[in-house]
């Protein structure tokens, strides 16, 4: 019988937690980041690490910013090496995972559902 939900190993969850905390810290400090991120408050909503621990998918949500999602993605990708180096110093592993950033559509989807329910 197949499992309906995908479970993550303890190592995946632990690494995701460490990466999440490191991302929050480096975004708060702002050192070595693209200057466009200085006035762009971001929330890291979740981090999902692949089973082989080589890729960390990081989902973010911006608040009160004049930048577009594409500009924020570009700024995060420009800062990716500095972020990855910072994370490498936080973890004790042979390899540091590749960091990939994605806009979290969860909030937008929740608003759409709320509007649909309101219209019923």
Swiss-Prot record:
Disulfide bonds: none
GO molecular function: ribosomal small subunit binding
Gene Ontology terms: biological process: maturation of SSU-rRNA
Cellular component annotations (GO), alphabetically ordered: cytosol
Domain of life: Bacteria
UniProt-listed InterPro entries: KH_dom-like_a/b, RbfA, RbfA_dom_sf, Ribosome-bd_factorA_CS
Keyword list, A-Z: Cytoplasm, Ribosome biogenesis
Entry function: One of several proteins that assist in the late maturation steps of the functional core of the 30S ribosomal subunit. Associates with free 30S ribosomal subunits (but not with 30S subunits that are part of 70S ribosomes or polysomes). Required for efficient processing of 16S rRNA. May interact with the 5'-terminal helix region of 16S rRNA.
Subunit text: Monomer. Binds 30S ribosomal subunits, but not 50S ribosomal subunits or 70S ribosomes.
PANTHER family reported in the protein's UniProt record: RIBOSOME-BINDING FACTOR A, CHLOROPLASTIC-RELATED
Family label: Belongs to the RbfA family.
Protein name: Ribosome-binding factor A
UniProt source species: Rickettsia africae (strain ESF-5)
């Amino acid at each position: 019988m197949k499992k309906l939900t995908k479970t993550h190993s303890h190592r995946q969850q632990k690494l995701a937690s460490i990466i999440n905390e490191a991302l929050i810290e480096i975004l708060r400090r702002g050192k070595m980041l693209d200057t466009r991120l200085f006035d762009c408050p971001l929330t890291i909503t979740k981090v999902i690490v692949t089973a082989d621990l080589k890729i960390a998918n990081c989902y973010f949500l911006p608040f009160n910013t004049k930048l577009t999602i594409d500009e924020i993605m570009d700024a995060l990708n420009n800062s990716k090496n500095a972020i990855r180096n910072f994370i490498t110093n936080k973890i004790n592993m042979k390899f540091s995972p590749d960091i990939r950033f994605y806009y979290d559509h969860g909030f937008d989807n929740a608003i759409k559902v709320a509007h649909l329910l309101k219209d019923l």
